Amino acid sequence: MEEIPFENAMARLEEIVDLMNQPSTSLDSSLKLYEEADALMRICESRIRKAEDRVRELSEKRNETLLSEEESCTH
C-alpha cells in the first residue's frame, strides 16, 4: 500500500469516514475500514514527514548559499 499516491490515500480516507458514518455499516465492516484507515494515515504521516524534511533541507541549503554570498561580498 506504500506506493499509493498521497492524494489518493487522502481521498480514500475521506471515503472511509463517509462509510463509517453510515448507519448501515456493520461493526465488522467498520473495524476493517478502521484498519485500512490506520494504514493510510501512517503512509500519509510518513510522506508529510519526508516532505517537511526535504523543505527543511532545501531551506538550510538556501540559507547557506545566502551566507556564503554575503561573506564573499564583504571580503
Swiss-Prot record:
One of its GO terms (biological process) is DNA catabolic process. It holds the Pfam family Exonuc_VII_S. Its EC number is 3.1.11.6. Its main location: cytoplasm. Keywords: Cytoplasm, Exonuclease, Hydrolase, Nuclease. It is an enzyme of class 3 (hydrolase). SUPFAM superfamilies: XseB-like (SSF116842). It is found in: Cytoplasm. It catalyses: Exonucleolytic cleavage in either 5'- to 3'- or 3'- to 5'-direction to yield nucleoside 5'-phosphates. The keyword Cytoplasm applies. GO terms for molecular function: exodeoxyribonuclease VII activity. The keyword Nucleotidyltransferase does not apply. GO terms for cellular component: cytosol; exodeoxyribonuclease VII complex. Belongs to the XseB family. Heterooligomer composed of large and small subunits. Bidirectionally degrades single-stranded DNA into large acid-insoluble oligonucleotides, which are then degraded further into small acid-soluble oligonucleotides. This is Exodeoxyribonuclease 7 small subunit.
